[in-house]
Design a protein with these regions (language model features):
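A short, N-terminal "cap"/entry segment at the start of jelly-roll beta-barrel domains
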Residues: 1-55
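Conserved short histidine dyad/triad with adjacent acidic residue
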Residues: 39-40, 53-69
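Ligand-binding loop in jelly-roll beta-barrel domains
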Residues: 103-130
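Short, conserved beta-strand element in jelly-roll/cupin
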Residues: 58-59, 68-85, 120
Length: 130
């Protein structure tokens, strides 16, 4: 297992956009949005659903080790392969596979090649972890 780092997101080249792009009753064309992304690690809030948000991730590379003390985090792979590393194992998600990381669990995510995912999490979650 790779060594864990406890570093803030400012040290990483992540493009994280917390503004909500779509309101209720608006169609969301995820493939069109993903096709325009040029960043290697992109995270955009698409919409709000009750007290949660749906975020689009277009990623290649790896995120730092982190945890969310108060919130679960759900990942759903749309295209490519997305890996969720836990302290004791790694979970590889292919297209149309999902996985929930419970609150308080140390994890990191990575994608050896470009992948497209959706994330569902509490609207108040700190994307970089606690």
């Amino acid at each position: 297992m790779a060594q864990k780092q406890n570093v803030g997101a400012s040290a990483f080249p992540y493009a994280t956009h917390l503004n909500v792009l779509f309101q209720q009753l608006q169609e969301i064309d995820v493939p069109a949005l993903a096709s325009k992304v040029e960043d290697r690690w992109y995270n955009q809030t698409l919409c709000k659903v009750n007290e949660s948000v749906v975020r689009l991730g277009v990623m290649q590379g790896e995120y730092h080790w982190h945890k969310h003390e108060d919130d679960d985090e759900f990942f759903f792979c749309l295209d490519g392969n997305f890996i969720v590393d836990l302290e004791d194992r790694s979970v590889i998600l292919g297209p149309l596979h999902g996985f929930t990381v419970p609150r308080g669990v140390v994890h990191r995510t990575r994608a050896p090649e470009r992948c497209v995912i959706l994330m569902i999490e509490n609207a108040g979650i700190v994307p970089t972890g606690d």
